[in-house]
Amino acid sequence: MFISLLLTFGFTNAQSDQDLLVEDMLLIADNFGTPAAEAAAIQSSAGWFSSARDLGEWKVEISVHGNAVFIPGSKQTKLASNKDFNILNIQGSTNALLPTVFGGDTDVVFEGELIGQEFSFDAIDGLNKEVVIHPFPQVTVGLPYGTEVALRFVPRVTINDVGVSTSGIGLKHNFAQYFKYSRPDDFQVAAVVTYSNINIDYEYTPIEISASGSKVLELNRIDVKADIWLLQGLVSKLYGDFEVFGAMGVTSSNFDYSMGGGGSLLPTLNDELGALGGNDVKFKADLGFNYYIGNFKISSAFTAGSFFNANLGLHYKI
């Protein structure tokens, strides 16, 4: 009976330690990956439409864009303290600045004890990025009733151990057509709604935690999947070959995190990460300029939100 109680206590204690370890790894993953999800929301909502004017029924515009999102210092590091963790500690210190996915290398080491056995692992290194460039093509088609549909798609590409794929669809409807005596060079007003899907994965130096001779957790990759909606009001004014436009909008983003690797705790960790993402709502403002040369248009737009993003586009109207 006594031996049975000891075995039960030992099993319960091991389960408790593993649950606490999962909570600690959730915090590390959240701090590391959240800035990437936020930056993805800003980039995916940029460059959809650069004019409130009607493109024209069944007219087609082919464009190539480049986004550059600027990463502030506050999004490159995250302060961590021993009091934030359950069984993990920062080796040799009570707190440390840890890199996010955009931060640089770090010499911070975590240590802890699981089922009576000590373990340690290096904190995850970041990409050391202050600017993230994202090019993409887009096709826009004019529909009846002053409406346009835009499509963009980028297959998965890997740059510096980061894989990215994006796709999306956007709709714009011109409301100036309902104004009496409205002309194309008058003040234009439109509403925009878009949907984007983004997949990001980042491979890093593996983290391994073992106890009682078995691998408890191995992590070597973080995956971020995002579904992002944009609702935006767009205004523009044409002055000859030059056009000014501005927009105010809101993004609603659903993020899904998961970790790649192995070990007995990985399924539990990913289940908890799946519940961690949730919905994030952000406001954003755009200001931009267009220059028309025949059937070509050069657009530039600047977005202010949780990040600052610049978009440059070259458009050709058929």
Label for each model-derived stretch:
Residues 14-110, 184:
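Outer-membrane beta-barrel biogenesis signature
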Residues 44, 51, 62-64, 137-143, ...:
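Residues on the lipid-exposed face of transmembrane beta-strands in outer-membrane beta-barrel proteins
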Residues 50-58, 73, 161, 176-189, ...:
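Short loop/turn motifs that connect adjacent beta-strands in outer-membrane beta-barrel proteins
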Residues 56-58, 130-135, 163-169, 185, ...:
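Residues that define the transmembrane beta-barrel architecture of outer-membrane proteins
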Residues 66-70, 153-157, 175, 193-199, ...:
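Transmembrane beta-strands of outer-membrane beta-barrel pores
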Residues 75-77, 109, 113-129, 158-164, ...:
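Extracellular/periplasm-exposed beta-strand and loop segments of Gram-negative cell-envelope proteins
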Residues 83-85, 92-96, 102, 245-318:
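Outer membrane beta-barrel transmembrane domains
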Residues 128-132, 143-144, 148-166, 277-281, ...:
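Solvent-exposed loop/turn segments connecting transmembrane beta-strands
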